[in-house]
């Protein structure tokens, strides 16, 4: 049987784009057990409260929920265990330098399979304040109104 190619999205963290200013993104491999892979292939995971830490020169994904595999036995995994991420050494050093700056953190944006291997899209992000969120919401609303007005004008409707 041929291996699947391309990118199959498993989970995305929509709340991260709302709560953080995304400065840079990285793709990292993830170390998983067998039942975790089977659970991911079933399309079950949650990145909502997830974050990454750099500890002893290694990047660890924390608080990401991959539920137990339904058909698993005593070999099942713990759903919220820390998982090691695979990055190049220079990427880890760059991230270490950037996360030492105040206010920057590592947040998972999406979890997917690429060419049969599980990957995580990590974002180097800065937290938004409440007024930033309100401003972004107002900008989106204004853009939607402009697009709606232009759509009416193009279709020939009068306001």
From Swiss-Prot:
CDD domains: SmpB
Keyword RNA-binding in annotation: yes
An annotated GO cellular component: cytosol
Keywords: Cytoplasm, RNA-binding
Compartments where located: Cytoplasm
A single BP term in Gene Ontology: trans-translation
A molecular function (GO) term: RNA binding
Coiled-coil residues: none
Presence of the UniProt keyword RNA-binding in the record: yes
Domain of life, per lineage: Bacteria
One Pfam family cited in the UniProt record for this chain: SmpB
Task performed by this protein: Required for rescue of stalled ribosomes mediated by trans-translation. Binds to transfer-messenger RNA (tmRNA), required for stable association of tmRNA with ribosomes. tmRNA and SmpB together mimic tRNA shape, replacing the anticodon stem-loop with SmpB. tmRNA is encoded by the ssrA gene; the 2 termini fold to resemble tRNA(Ala) and it encodes a 'tag peptide', a short internal open reading frame. During trans-translation Ala-aminoacylated tmRNA acts like a tRNA, entering the A-site of stalled ribosomes, displacing the stalled mRNA.
Family according to the record: Belongs to the SmpB family.
Protein name: SsrA-binding protein
């Amino acid at each position: 049987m041929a291996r699947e190619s391309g990118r199959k999205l498993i989970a995305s963290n929509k709340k991260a784009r709302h709560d953080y200013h995304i400065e840079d993104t990285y793709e990292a491999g993830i170390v998983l057990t067998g039942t975790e892979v089977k659970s991911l292939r079933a399309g079950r995971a949650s990145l909502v409260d997830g974050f990454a830490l750099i500890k002893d020169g290694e990047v660890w994904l924390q608080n990401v929920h991959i539920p137990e595999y339904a058909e698993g036995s005593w070999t099942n995994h713990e759903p919220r265990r820390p998982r090691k991420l695979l990055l190049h050494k220079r990427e880890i050093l760059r991230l270490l330098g950037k996360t030492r700056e105040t206010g920057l953190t590592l947040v998972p944006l999406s979890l997917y399979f690429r060419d049969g291997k599980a990957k995580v899209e990590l974002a180097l992000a800065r937290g938004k304040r409440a007024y930033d969120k309100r401003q972004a919401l107002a900008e989106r609303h204004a853009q939607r109104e402009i697009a709606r007005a232009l759509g009416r004008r193009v279709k020939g409707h009068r306001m």
